[in-house]
Amino acid sequence: NPYIKVRYGFAGSFKNADEGKQLALNQNINGSDIIYTLAGDAGSGVIAASNEAKFLIIGSGSDQHFSEVNRVLTNTRKLYNVIVFQTVKDTLQGRFPSGKVIYDLKNGGVELSLLNKNVPEYISNRLEQIRDDIMNGWIRVGVEIPEWAKRQNQR
């Protein structure tokens, strides 16, 4: 979508809630309407910033609807139960998946939690269609990390 601008930012630590909050506030000041948060306590700082500046967030890991119901649209969840079960099953069948193994939407490794009740039905329906299109291979999901972000991770 040419009208969507994606911004990246790194707090530098999973444990720094203040840095996560400041990063989120800066992204919001620069035009971010929705912020996808990762990183433990740094993510808690993003939640605090969303209360202060009134922007929306997508949480990750655990279901963060319980922390700030009106600010959290949804959460991405890693389904460790699926990953562990599949790894044990493959190992018992003599097919231990050594090396790089990616679990994604298509193979049941991740999902979105239930959407916030304030998300309009047409958006919920569109997200379901996008999910189906990913599952059927019509939409290809990839990760392209900008050069500056690669350099940031090397510090």
Q: What are these model-predicted stretches?
A:
Residues 1-155:
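A residue-level marker of the well-folded mature domains of exported/periplasmic proteins
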